[in-house]
Amino acid sequence: MLEMQLFFVSYVLYGLGFVSLIFLPTEHQRLYYLHLVSVIIGLIANYEMKFNILLAMFHSAVHNLWPFLKNTGYDDTEKSVYDVFCHTIMMMLCYHRIYYSQNIVIDSEYLFHVLSVLFILGAMINCLVSHLIIDSHHAQLHSIFEYTTIFQAVSTGYWVATMLWYNNLNHQDFYYHWLLWITLMTTNWFIYKFWPKLVGISMRYKYVEAVFIICTWYSGVLSSQKISC
């Protein structure tokens, strides 16, 4: 029963959150929807989830203040350093939360920690390169930045996996859930790489922001009820 609730309920509700965006006619309405629901859930969530919800909203704000991803695709004239730094911090916070979860059960604990450290180091390299390319026309640097953004795709999967099961990080299947979301978001990175026009469509429907925001809603509601589902 618990497995069905974890895999089915959390995943379906997450997907429905994205479906709602399709029916909203303008970008502003989609943005208001994401933030309004987040504020409402944040009011009833516990302090940990309040912080996570605010962090997801902050990530959205960064995308709007420094829009290096636009409806037209990637814009290398905008600063990306703030976004990738935000991604890296979010992944580090997730790793810290999982690492210190009480009675955490991970079948491949050593591999989990090794991969997590490698992912964080890769994301930090991407942060450094994103700073170096500011006002730089060095083609090789821009190429390195582009390919190291795969670690930010990993950080997205890391965040989604942690937020969806935030109240059940000690579940025996968490490791597979974690791997699934990292794989999905990494696949998404490759899709963007080969079909760059999808970046513009994603930005138009606020997908890039919604990925981080919607996954906090389910755990936010549960945290207010102190229920482990």
UniProtKB/Swiss-Prot annotation:
Its main location: membrane. It is found in: Membrane. It comes from the Viruses. The chain crosses the membrane at residues 6-26, 36-56, 80-99, 114-134, 144-164, 174-194, 207-224. GO terms for cellular component: membrane. Keywords: Membrane, Transmembrane, Transmembrane helix. It is a multi-pass membrane protein. Belongs to the mimivirus L68/R809 family. This is Uncharacterized protein R809.
